[in-house]
Curated annotation (Swiss-Prot):
Superkingdom per UniProt: Bacteria
Keyword Ion transport belongs to the record: no
Keyword hit for Hydrolase: no
Subunit structure: The Tat system comprises two distinct complexes: a TatABC complex, containing multiple copies of TatA, TatB and TatC subunits, and a separate TatA complex, containing only TatA subunits. Substrates initially bind to the TatABC complex, which probably triggers association of the separate TatA complex to form the active translocon.
Family: Belongs to the TatB family.
Name this polypeptide is given: Sec-independent protein translocase protein TatB
Signal peptide: none
Example GO biological process: protein transport by the Tat complex
InterPro entries, sorted: TatA/B/E (IPR003369), TatB (IPR018448)
Keywords recorded for this protein, A-Z: Cell inner membrane, Cell membrane, Membrane, Protein transport, Translocation, Transmembrane, Transmembrane helix, Transport
Any one Pfam family match given in the protein's UniProt record, by short name: TatA_B_E
Species this protein is from: Neisseria meningitidis serogroup B (strain ATCC BAA-335 / MC58)
Lineage: Bacteria, Pseudomonadati, Pseudomonadota, Betaproteobacteria, Neisseriales
């Protein structure tokens, strides 16, 4: 620790021997050794403290670098999210107000009202379609009849037979509107009246059962007569 050689130590020992004498020299040497040991321990503790501080400083620097990198990543993610939100807002602002809403459907689009009943317009449309088809068929049939009459010439219409008359009546009856018959339904109360249990009779039966279980004959104690 101290840059002393062997010659310097011998010189110091001779001076101490002359100054202190042979009696006090061993005690002085022990005291000097203790002081040197304390000094070495103090220097070692200071050196260890310096090493610990250096390690803590390195760890502190590494921690600061890690926190700086994490903050940089966080800022970059925040900027990316802000840019995406701005793009979405720009897209939504570019749309018209009615284009932002989804397509609205009403019960009328399905041919029913709010209660689920069919609308009269749908029924009329169906009947109009049937009526539109029927005249075309009639005109086609009349044109075909006229064509046949033009080819064969004017002929007398045949008389209506019984079979044709029955078929016509059947078609007329089926075309008529069906008659809806209303049926009256009456409800009859069929609840069965349950009888109320007779509590008095049940109580009497329980008392009679208890009496039956009682012993009928009681044992009489026998007295012993002591003979003198």
């Amino acid at each position: 620790m101290f840059d002393f050689g062997l010659g310097e130590l011998v010189f110091v020992g001779i001076i101490a021997l002359i100054v202190l004498g042979p009696e006090r020299l061993p005690e002085a040497a022990r005291t000097a050794g203790r002081l040197i040991g304390r000094l070495q321990r103090f220097v070692g503790s200071v050196k260890q403290e310096f090493d610990t501080q250096i390690e803590l400083e390195e760890l502190r620097k590494a921690k600061q670098e890690f926190e700086a990198a994490a903050a940089q990543v966080r800022d970059s993610l925040k900027e990316t999210g802000t840019d995406m939100e701005g793009n979405l807002h720009d897209i939504s602002d570019g749309l018209k107000p009615w284009e932002k809403l989804p397509e609205q459907r009403t019960p009328a689009d399905f041919g029913v009202d709010e209660n689920g009943n069919p609308l009269p317009d749908a029924a009329n449309t169906l009947s109009d379609g049937i009526s539109d088809v029927m005249p075309s068929e009639r005109s086609y049939a009349s044109a075909e009849t006229l064509g046949d009459s033009g080819q064969t010439g004017s002929t007398a219409e045949p008389a209506e037979t019984d079979q044709d008359r029955a078929w016509r009546e059947y078609l007329t009856a089926s075309a008529a509107a069906p008659v809806v018959q209303t049926v009256e339904v009456s409800y009859i109360d069929t609840a069965v009246e349950t009888p109320v249990p007779h509590t008095t009779s049940l109580r009497k039966q329980a008392i009679s059962r208890k009496r039956d279980f009682r012993p009928k004959h009681r044992a009489k104690p026998k007295l012993r007569v002591r003979k003198s």
